[in-house]
Amino acid sequence: MAELAKYERVVIDQDICISCGACVAACPYQALELDENGKSRLIWEKCKDDFSCVAVCPVKAISKASEATPEAKAKKGWYRFGKSLTPEEQKAFEEWKTKYGITAPPV
């Protein structure tokens, strides 16, 4: 699973998300889901950097990690995962956070 570090992933701004589900419907890998509050959440191991979710979000709540503003990256809860990560996935995730300058802890 360490190969996950090669993927860029997306930033999901929970403050902007309107719970429309367009991102969930657009993702060919089923890498997004709506959480218990109706907000978009990334399923890390399914994401393959297709970025369909970025293109269809009507309020621009989703962006590529490399293009997200520092303010968006610093918000608590901007990246959300559907399940706990394995130790290998956690290591890959930490490498990804370092690569893209991520500072906020997960919720």
Swiss-Prot record:
PROSITE patterns tied to this protein: 4FE4S_FER_1, 4FE4S_FER_2
Superkingdom of source: Archaea
Purpose: Ferredoxins are iron-sulfur proteins that transfer electrons in a wide variety of metabolic reactions.
Domain 4Fe-4S ferredoxin-type residues, every copy: 8-37, 38-67
Subunit-structure text: Monomer.
Keyword tags: 3Fe-4S, 4Fe-4S, Electron transport, Iron, Iron-sulfur, Metal-binding, Repeat, Transport
Pfam families per the UniProt record, alphabetical: Fer4_10
Cofactor detail note: Binds 1 [4Fe-4S] cluster.
Species assigned in the record: Pyrobaculum islandicum (strain DSM 4184 / JCM 9189 / GEO3)
Signal sequence, renumbered to the chain: none
SUPFAM superfamilies the UniProt entry points to: 4Fe-4S ferredoxins
Keyword Coiled coil attributed: no
Cofactor(s) in the UniProt record: [4Fe-4S] cluster; [3Fe-4S] cluster
Protein name per UniProt: Ferredoxin
Post-translational modification: The N-terminus is blocked.
Misc: Has a maximum absorption at about 282 nm.
Source species taxonomy: Archaea, Thermoproteota, Thermoprotei, Thermoproteales, Thermoproteaceae
Positions annotated to bind [3Fe-4S] cluster: C27, C47, C53
A GO MF term: 4 iron, 4 sulfur cluster binding
